[in-house]
Amino acid sequence: MANRLKEKFVNEITPDLVKKFDYTSVMQVPKIEKIVLNMGVGDAVTNSKNLDEAVAELELISGQKPLVTKAKKSIAGFRLREGMSIGAKVTLRGERMYDFLDKLVNVSLPRVRDFRGVSSKAFDGRGNYTLGVREQLIFPEIDFDNVNRVRGLDIVIVTTANTDEESRELLAQFGMPFEK
């Protein structure tokens, strides 16, 4: 069974975007390539248990095992040595990517306190969108009682769009609630 958002993309969004941007071929229509979730755990330097908890939470949120990220350089001011584990990231593609986007747009974002829509200025100029989440508690898989520290995470949606305008339209069609 194909994902609901994937079917919507093929049957509704693609024809709409072809009409709106006058593409000559349906292959020119921008699509979502991947979604990267990144959780920086700066306090993992002093307590490595914090990193294990962050990895477990990221695994619950994404449905796949995160990659532990390591420091590239030593920074004495942060008591950081090169090669120390300081975060975790997950790259979602295919089915899991569409599942996550569906969950993000329809379940998680509406659970954010006094939510007025996501910023429409967070595009990078090449059609990719970055969204920062202040607390991981907005995701339904995270049990409030088992969380000992509120952590934020970065969500990067990488598209094949050439311009921010095309990318914004694509995400808006997927139901991303941009602020007015």
From Swiss-Prot:
Xref: InterPro entries: Ribosomal_uL5, Ribosomal_uL5_bac-type, Ribosomal_uL5_C, Ribosomal_uL5_CS, Ribosomal_uL5_dom_sf, Ribosomal_uL5_N
An example Gene Ontology CC term for this record: ribosome
UniProt keyword list: Ribonucleoprotein, Ribosomal protein, RNA-binding, rRNA-binding, tRNA-binding
SS bonds (residue pairs): none
GO biological process: translation
Family matches, as Gene3D superfamilies: 3.30.1440.10
GO molecular function: rRNA binding; structural constituent of ribosome; tRNA binding
Pfam families registered for this protein in UniProt: Ribosomal_L5 (PF00281), Ribosomal_L5_C (PF00673)
Assembly and binders: Part of the 50S ribosomal subunit; part of the 5S rRNA/L5/L18/L25 subcomplex. Contacts the 5S rRNA and the P site tRNA. Forms a bridge to the 30S subunit in the 70S ribosome.
HAMAP family the UniProt entry points to: Ribosomal_uL5_B
Family membership: Belongs to the universal ribosomal protein uL5 family.
Purpose of the protein: This is one of the proteins that bind and probably mediate the attachment of the 5S RNA into the large ribosomal subunit, where it forms part of the central protuberance. In the 70S ribosome it contacts protein S13 of the 30S subunit (bridge B1b), connecting the 2 subunits; this bridge is implicated in subunit movement. Contacts the P site tRNA; the 5S rRNA and some of its associated proteins might help stabilize positioning of ribosome-bound tRNAs.
Name this polypeptide is given: Large ribosomal subunit protein uL5
Organism: Pediococcus pentosaceus (strain ATCC 25745 / CCUG 21536 / LMG 10740 / 183-1w)
Lineage of source species: Bacteria, Bacillati, Bacillota, Bacilli, Lactobacillales
Gene name for this UniProt entry: rplE
